[in-house]
């Protein structure tokens, strides 16, 4: 018995000591209790996701550890090309081969980068030392040219949002991480910068906090601490060591020791809708736990009243399993139907307060999108809200024909042939009207214009959307928020979207691809939209209009034009007629092009709804084989028009395929995650895709209610409203729910603010397994707002779920 006791003690000691040692795990990153170090698990340096990355007590505190060509790089700065990544379990190390330039980004690609005439290869290795520290070593194949020495260096970026007000120590000096960058300024390689905040051999970050303290020591060149926000508003703090003349092997050698708190475990996170639930709705909270934890056997539900909390339920907690790096359990309180305010308790953790009531989706849900977000995004208008001016009259000098530009920024390209009668630099009339700024930037993309028009039209058709809270005066280019004008806001917004789509079509004889500024300095502008140009056409600051041959995009636009024609028929018959005629003309120009079957099915479905033309119905039936082979991408569109099809074989085969597809989806979802929707986390938050999936599921249910339940689009809405992974369980819809995203990548991001009704993509994946949604205004991959579905899909889902439980009388 005594031998068994000592054996158990030795085993326990071994397990505990293993938790204190930083070692490689089966996911190919270094792990110990309270610390993870990943190394090129991500490669998205423009988005601060790459290189050496430190996750301390569950929070990503440093990233992008790599060799860069400047002390304070930005989004359009050169980044290396990465090669072979080698994981050495025996030596507890990972090495990464890299080189400059990256030919796929050098003056080409979605956002072309201008690289200098510099070619070199290097390798970075990180290695665990056995005491909770790790080393970083940079080896160059050959010395850098003299002119690049001290300019290039190894940079490690520190996330600023968690450091403001904290302190640092550098050898014998100290300082505070300030909320804003300050001078004195100095010229550095032709650019004004503040210079290093401190220089030395040993840097201690946040020495006052055990949960945040990190020590970085250099065994080679001195360490410099820079504030990367001096030249880039979205910059981070940067720790760097420059590459010196003649350096090759061991050009940089650091030891990094992030402090860890013994026995630390991830705190349970209760994920429940920030808005609440209808009494008859399924109500499940999810609790996210440390992977080593065993779920508590029970949870509690409290009702809130005059005396505070009243216990109304104690119920079994159900283990779901593991997903990403956490363990999950579900808390089901669906049987509670009494209206009121509630809180879920799991151990000593309490959720936010939420409502259960029949009117849960009636107000304060979709309305902020229609009352705030869409008006604020309107181009060619001045947008007022009582005393506030959201933005002044903008872009009235739109737009010049873009010159041939193989690689502009933000994905724009202009071929030598623009397929119009306009020459490069000529002002194209009819573009100084309508449209919405695409996202956190100010361009107009035809697909986001059309997508917004389509969703607004579908909400009018499906749910009778008729809401007036805004005065929109097209003649005076004026918007007054919360000043009704007696006209449906959704109708007016559709007219505004059509003004830019059809205005371009009339002038160009085709669709434009988009309208965007010509200069990168304009593009990165943070401020009032009216500041971008002078509103006087014909000079250098005018935006450019881009054109293209793109039948896929033309088919997307047909969808919006055809839907708009139906809802405008009584209110604006002339515009309705032009919309439908343009949709038909676009169809005639694209219908014979091979491929694009999914897009053709969606376009045909909308044309059928608008015309009931037998030729369109027959064309759709003739595409049966293509529909069956691409059903996951287009089957939902058939749901709205299946009633117009008389072909029994077509209907039977489509129904069988829909049944099989939905069964596969269910199996996939159950294996994916506990969130009730198919979910594959990625570098970008998945919220927009999940919303779109939910809208498509609504139409599947509409066409085949006996085969397709409503749970998918209900769960999609709950995901957006807070039932999603990670410690930040805010609603992705700004201003909707108890806690929502209040610092977003919108046009007012420089003010650390938000636009009510904007919807962000949300929780992103820091590969391989960390869900992250930070409070930071400059993560486009987490908190950007977009048109074309980002916000309007959310509106649609709210209305769909509301109608499900509160059907019209």
Predicted segments, located by residue:
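Sec-dependent N-terminal signal peptides
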Residues: 4-13
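Beta-strand-rich N-terminal accessory domains
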Residues: 19-89, 188-193, 202
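Extended, loop-rich substrate-binding clefts of extracytoplasmic carbohydrate-active enzymes
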Residues: 71-143
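Acidic (Asp/Glu-rich), glycine- and aromatic
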Residues: 135-175, 348-360
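Low-complexity, Pro/Ser/Thr- and charge-rich linker/hinge segments at domain boundaries
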Residues: 162-169, 263-282, 351-389
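Aromatic (Trp/Tyr) and acidic
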Residues: 190-211, 222, 275, 283-350, ...
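Beta-strand-rich recognition/accessory modules
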Residues: 199-264, 801
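Acidic, glycine-anchored loop motifs typical of Ca2+
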Residues: 476-493
């Amino acid at each position: 018995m005594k031998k068994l006791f000592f054996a158990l003690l030795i085993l326990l000691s071994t397990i505990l000591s293993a938790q204190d040692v930083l070692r490689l795990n089966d996911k190919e990153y270094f792990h110990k209790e309270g610390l993870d170090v990943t190394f090129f698990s991500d490669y998205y340096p423009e988005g601060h996701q790459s290189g050496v990355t430190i996750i301390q007590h569950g929070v990503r505190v440093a990233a992008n550890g790599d060799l860069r060509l400047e002390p304070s790089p930005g989004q359009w700065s050169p980044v290396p090309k990465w090669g072979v990544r080698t994981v050495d379990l025996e030596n507890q190390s990972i090495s990464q081969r890299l080189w400059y330039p990256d030919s796929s980004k050098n003056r080409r690609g979605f956002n072309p980068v201008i690289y200098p005439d510099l070619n070199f290869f290097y390798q970075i290795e990180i290695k665990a030392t056995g005491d909770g520290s790790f080393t970083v070593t940079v080896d160059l194949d050959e010395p850098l040219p003299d002119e690049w020495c001290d300019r290039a260096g190894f940079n490690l970026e520190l996330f600023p949002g968690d450091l403001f007000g904290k302190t640092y120590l550098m050898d014998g000096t100290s300082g505070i991480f300030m909320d804003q960058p300050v001078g004195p300024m100095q010229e550095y390689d032709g650019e004004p910068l503040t210079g290093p905040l401190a220089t030395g051999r040993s840097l201690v970050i946040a020495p006052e906090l055990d949960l945040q303290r990190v020590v970085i020591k250099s065994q080679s060149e001195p360490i410099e601490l820079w504030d990367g926000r001096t030249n880039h508003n979205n910059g981070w703090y940067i720790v760097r060591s420059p590459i010196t003349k003649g350096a090759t092997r061991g050009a940089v050698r650091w030891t990094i020791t992030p402090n860890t708190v013994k026995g630390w475990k991830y705190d349970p996170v209760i994920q429940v809708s920030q808005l609440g639930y209808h009494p008859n709705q399924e109500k499940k909270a999810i609790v996210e736990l440390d992977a080593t934890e065993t779920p508590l056997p029970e949870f509690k539900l409290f009702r809130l009243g005059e005396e505070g909390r009243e216990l109304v339920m104690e119920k079994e907690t159900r283990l779901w399993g593991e997903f990403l790096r956490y363990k999950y359990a579900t808390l089901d309180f669906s049987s509670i139907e009494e209206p009121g305010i509630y809180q879920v308790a799991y151990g000593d953790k309490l959720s936010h307060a939420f409502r259960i009531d029949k009117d849960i989706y009636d107000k304060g849900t979709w309305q902020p999108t229609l009352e705030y977000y869409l008006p604020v995004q309107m181009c060619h208008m001045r947008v007022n809200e009582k005393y506030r001016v959201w933005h002044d009259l903008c872009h009235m000098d739109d737009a010049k024909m873009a010159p041939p530009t193989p690689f502009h920024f933000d994905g724009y390209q202009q071929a030598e042939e623009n397929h119009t009668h306009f020459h490069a630099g000529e002002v194209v009339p009819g573009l100084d009207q309508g449209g919405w700024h695409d996202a956190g930037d100010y361009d107009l993309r035809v697909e986001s214009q059309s997508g917004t028009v389509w969703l607004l039209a579908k909400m009018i058709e499906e749910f009778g959307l008729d809401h007036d809270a805004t005065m929109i005066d097209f003649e005076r280019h004026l918007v007054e928020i919360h000043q009704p004008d007696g006209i449906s806001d959704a109708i007016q917004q559709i007219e505004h979207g059509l003004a830019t789509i059809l205005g371009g079509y009339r002038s160009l004889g085709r669709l434009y691809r988009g309208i965007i500024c010509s200069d990168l300095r304009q593009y990165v502008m943070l401020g009032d939209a009216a500041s971008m140009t002078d509103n006087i056409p014909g000079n250098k600051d005018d935006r450019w209009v881009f054109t293209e041959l793109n039948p896929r995009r033309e088919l997307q636009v047909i969808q919006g034009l055809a839907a708009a024609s139906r809802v405008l028929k009584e209110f604006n018959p002339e515009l309705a007629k032009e919309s439908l005629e343009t949709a038909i003309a676009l169809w005639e120009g694209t219908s014979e092009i091979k491929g694009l079957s999914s897009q053709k099915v969606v376009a045909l479905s909308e044309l059928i709804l608008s015309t009931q033309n037998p030729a369109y119905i027959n064309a759709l039936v003739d595409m049966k084989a293509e529909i069956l082979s691409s059903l996951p991408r287009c089957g939902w569109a058939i749901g709205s028009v299946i009633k117009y099809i008389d072909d029994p074989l077509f209907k039977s085969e489509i129904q069988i395929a829909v049944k099989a597809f939905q069964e596969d989806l269910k199996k996939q979802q159950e294996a994916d995650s506990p969130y009730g929707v198919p979910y594959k986390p990625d570098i970008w938050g998945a919220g927009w895709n999940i919303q779109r999936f939910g809208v498509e599921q609504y139409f599947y249910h509409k066409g085949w209610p006996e085969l397709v339940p409503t749970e998918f689009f209900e769960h999609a809405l709950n995901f957006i409203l807070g039932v999603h992974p990670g410690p930040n369980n805010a609603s992705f819809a700004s201003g909707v729910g108890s806690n929502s995203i209040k610092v977003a990548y919108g046009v007012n991001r420089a003010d650390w603010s938000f636009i009510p009704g904007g919807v962000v993509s949300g929780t992103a994946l820091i590969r391989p397994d960390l869900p992250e949604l930070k409070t930071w205004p400059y993560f486009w991959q987490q908190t950007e707002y977009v048109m074309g579905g980002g916000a309007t899909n959310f509106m649609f889902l709210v209305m769909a779920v509301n109608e499900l439980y509160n059907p019209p009388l």
